[in-house]
Amino acid sequence: MAIEMLGLILAGGQGTRLGKLTKDVAKPAVPFGGRYRIIDFALSNCANSNVKNVGVITQYQPLTLNAHIGNGAPWGLNGINSGVTILQPYSSQEGSKWFEGTSHAVYQNISYIDQQNPEYVLILSGDHIYKMDYEAMLESHKEREASLTVSVMEVPLEEASRFGIMNTDDNDRIIEFEEKPKEPKSNLASMGIYIFNWKRLREVLVNGYSKGNPMEDFGGDVIPAYIEAGENVFAYRFKGYWKDVGTIDSLHQSSMEFLDLNNELNITDKSWRIYSHNDISAPQFITEKSNVKNALVGDGCYVDGTVLHSILSQNVHVQEGTVIEDSFIMSGTFIGENVTIKNAIIGENAKIGDNVEIIGENEVAVIGHGEIKGENKNEQ
């Protein structure tokens, strides 16, 4: 049975710039916002945009990510006419098939895509924080009779070299594209979100690999090839909140922005919910002696200290005399007495002993998942 549009989320990235936080966890599975993982935003956008069939392409350290996604039930992707499929590298008679790039990952999963039989494929990155209506982007794609539509946004010119940068004509047709240029000519950046006509993309990928001209990356190979061939390639301008949380600084900054009641993500918006898989925990307990201001405190937390402008994920234990400020504490972490944590990210299931100081002065301080720092006498 044919479907109109298949979603493909590229979720195999290692995220080396996140250091300790991705040592054993794929970047899209890194926690965010107290109750989410980064990939929840792409999955929830699919659910809210009526994209009912989604393939998640994984590679690096996929166990936590796979367990989190499960059968897709939190996002409504477990119905009769909907579903989520985890797509991992595999071996065949031709040998191993590790993904060499973004478009190579799609090429290696052609059989799955053909099985879904879509008219269009929506390519997404699994490591960005944003809300977006993909149906509106698809309507723009169809109205312009595009072969490829690239979602774009304006970024500060000094940051443009981190992105694929393009120039457009007056009708937003893309006439020039350069992946991460050293000297960018514009500040119109690719968001790593694409809609392709599947038959044409399939033809381009198969021809490239069969003729010894492999198309391994969308930004470096496929998009420039489309433009050079005179294909109808258009930009779709996005003006909402979008953050690439690929560095410690950007993850911390986005987490702190999450605490702003006026932030553009508006996580309380019932018309565009962000869904996630969460364990059932007891209610949070805030003691009489505690001081909690401008903070998100997850279920199962016990707080007997001071928490200021910070996020505590589920089941975080904060003992008496401890001060946490401008920090993101991930789930399951135990923090002892008289601890000072400022400008920091603490990984899941970490243990922080009594009288420890973790202060990010010139850069964000990071404690990895399961890391132990100091000793505490009252650990529960």
UniProtKB/Swiss-Prot annotation:
Metabolic or biological pathway, per its Swiss-Prot or TrEMBL entry: Glycan biosynthesis; glycogen biosynthesis
Gene3D superfamilies, A to Z: Hexapeptide repeat proteins (2.160.10.10), Spore Coat Polysaccharide Biosynthesis Protein SpsA, Chain A (3.90.550.10)
Record-listed alpha-D-glucose 1-phosphate binding positions: 164, 179-180, 190
Keywords recorded for this protein, A-Z: ATP-binding, Carbohydrate metabolism, Glycogen biosynthesis, Glycogen metabolism, Nucleotide-binding, Nucleotidyltransferase, Transferase
One Pfam family here: Hexapep_GlmU
Entry's EC annotation: 2.7.7.27
GO BP annotations, alphabetical order: glycogen biosynthetic process
Catalytically driven reaction(s): alpha-D-glucose 1-phosphate + ATP + H(+) = ADP-alpha-D-glucose + diphosphate
Origin superkingdom: Bacteria
Top EC category: transferase
Single GO MF annotation: ATP binding
Record family assignment: Belongs to the bacterial/plant glucose-1-phosphate adenylyltransferase family.
Function description: Involved in the biosynthesis of ADP-glucose, a building block required for the elongation reactions to produce glycogen. Catalyzes the reaction between ATP and alpha-D-glucose 1-phosphate (G1P) to produce pyrophosphate and ADP-Glc.
Subunit structure: Homotetramer.
Entry protein name: Glucose-1-phosphate adenylyltransferase
Organism: Lactococcus lactis subsp. lactis (strain IL1403) (Streptococcus lactis)
Lineage of producing organism: Bacteria, Bacillati, Bacillota, Bacilli, Lactobacillales
